[in-house]
Amino acid sequence: MATHKTLLMCLGLPLFFPGALAQNHAPPGCSPDLDPLYYNLCDRSGAWGIVLEAVAGAGIITTFVLTIILVASLPFVQDTKKRSLLGTQVFFLLGTLGLFCLVFACVVKPDFSTCASRRFLFGVLFAICFSCLIAHTLSLNFLARKNHGPRGWVIFTVALLLTLVEVIINTEWLIITLVRGGGQVSTPGNGSADWTVTSPCAIANMDFVMALIYVMLLLLAAFLGAWPTLCGRFKRWRKHGVFVLLTTATSIAIWVVWIVMYTYGNKQHHSPTWDDPTLAIALAANAWTFVFFYVIPEVSQVTKPSPEQSYQGDMYPTRGVGYETILKEQTGQSMFVENKAFSMDEPASAKRPVSPYSGYNGQLLTSVYQPTEMALMHKGPSEGAYDVILPRATANSQVMGSANSTLRAEDMYMVQSHQVATPTKDGKISQDQSPKNKTRW
């Protein structure tokens, strides 16, 4: 008998060795000591896991950097209307970051924890993003019509309440589905019956999609709510409505594709192994749609001032008023229509900006002969004509029309010598009264 048992064991060992080797065999690119649950993250024969892992990792880094930029730009936001939306936009970025992280749960092989996180977080994270878009469109509708919208905490509360509805729905659905899938068993030694909980991976694809009806309604509401912002009176808010419209339209296309593939396409082609890649691709594609079509444009617009603030900056300049400012103001006055009847008598130099120091010729005032009234009163009536002291306009108009406003002593002497040579009405010749020969008082 012992000989027969030994012979059977020797014949049966080759039959069990291939199965044992197959269980311990690791795919190319993975370590033999690695848990088989994570083979898709390093399997080079099926590259979809590695590609999605790289795409999701890049998305996590990008979203994290954009979140830091958005929070750091808070002190530089001049428009109070845009500042009130920063809390909702940061909440949106956290939801997008969660979508990129959930891609890894869809890449690894299913077990109880990964399937539970997929079923619960898939709808909750999308509800966060779509609720923030709805709250943003609600604010944009007020801004596009009245140029003032709700306060920031009101917008954030709307997004938070819409998200909590999906949290409640998913929690109840997951509990009811898992308990309903189990059977009723009796506990030994106890008269009551207990309910066994089935695995969340056993949930049908159609049931999973039906649980996302509320999320689809949020997506549709965000898409329809973005259209009225394009018809508002204040046009500067239209571009924000365009950002939301592009994001929701692309998301609708992605959701239609992955739902058709998840519920119909994979069954028709008899490839249920593509269920997990379908969910992972949908998550990564929709998350990058949020980043490219909504987050990056909004971050680039958040620090731009409003037109009202730009107008106030032009009305009240902060720089000082100097000589350059005066010249600019004089140049700006040329845009008005002038009366040409008076502009003909003005010299051409008056049309150019004149420096305040252009009238100074470098001579001191002591060289100018200007007798005071007291000196004339003490001196008495002069022998000469009054036009010697107060010269009239003569042929020498070049002296009077010069840029200097005072007469020089040499010019006065030339006028007096000209009048001395002219006989007076009494037939006498006026004496040469040069300013140099007069006694000073």
Swiss-Prot record:
CDD domains, per the entry: 7tmC_RAIG3_GPRC5C
Residues carrying a glycan: 190
Bilayer topology term: Multi-pass membrane protein
Modified residues annotated as Phosphothreonine in this record: 422
A GO CC term assigned to this protein in UniProt: intracellular membrane-bounded organelle
GO molecular function, one term: protein kinase activator activity
Ranges in the topological domain labelled Extracellular: 23-49, 106-119, 176-207, 262-278
Positions of post-translational Phosphotyrosine modification: 413
Signal peptide start and end residues: 1-22
Ranges where the record places region Disordered: 419-441
PROSITE patterns: G_PROTEIN_RECEP_F3_4
Residue ranges, compositional bias (Polar residues): 430-441
Alphabetically ordered keywords of this record: Cell membrane, G-protein coupled receptor, Glycoprotein, Membrane, Phosphoprotein, Receptor, Signal, Transducer, Transmembrane, Transmembrane helix
Transmembrane segments: 50-70, 85-105, 120-140, 155-175, 208-228, 241-261, 279-299
Stated family: Belongs to the G-protein coupled receptor 3 family.
Function per UniProt: This retinoic acid-inducible G-protein coupled receptor provide evidence for a possible interaction between retinoid and G-protein signaling pathways.
Full protein name: G-protein coupled receptor family C group 5 member C
